[in-house]
């Protein structure tokens, strides 16, 4: 099993690489790439951790050497949010970065499962799909927008609010990965009920949690460590699916034939081909149905931005 992390010298990439070095199955290969010259050194640093995961680092303009033979590619490359920015402000820089990297993925490891972390995810995933279509290698079951951070935040905040063991909290988060497009389905959480006020405030906190971190870091960065953990959870689920483990389910932003938009975050069953099955997200409350329907114009606009960027 070979996993490649593109953007491995950044805050998310280093956290993700550390977690993968400690969690990937014995005998796996972990390949780190970043434009920054420090990247081979990050790999040397991590190589001193005593786990049976072989690690190599690559720097420079071309990620191809890192991608050869990759089964899973996780892309966190790009610029981070600063105070006063929202995820869409990142588009002007990150769109080009994702396009260029995906062109190399399409040429080097077109069958790999690709997880896009780089924001704005609503748009960068659409860019990746269009690039792969142009290259003639697009497989909608192998491309994912990583929305796991919205899920782990939801699990954490619900457990805190209700005094639950966080390991027992399961929730679907649907829609997209920014602002109003993030929709935690609180009505489905087993064993708890929420007042209307709690639903409104908790939904808003989950939607704005990224901004909470950006502001708390006071210009010193965005959510890198929690995102690294979320990306590792999702990446490990991709690996477990590839290894044939049963019932591996995660929410992800995918081209899953949703009635709502071309790309939509919902639960998917993972397996040897990436997505084995897109799962229904179940019954929703009136509040959730309204929130879902009112986000769609925003979500579709984000997607169109990505499609138009490549065309």
From Swiss-Prot:
SUPFAM superfamilies recorded = LDH C-terminal domain-like, NAD(P)-binding Rossmann-fold domains
Q: Which GO-annotated molecular functions does the record name?
A: L-malate dehydrogenase (NAD+) activity
- Binding, NAD(+): 7-13, 34, 94, 117-119, 227
The keyword Magnesium is annotated on this UniProt entry: no
Pfam families (UniProt xref): Ldh_1_C, Ldh_1_N
Write out the catalysed reaction: (S)-malate + NAD(+) = oxaloacetate + NADH + H(+)
User: Self-association or partners: how does it assemble?
Assistant: Homodimer.
The protein here is known as Malate dehydrogenase
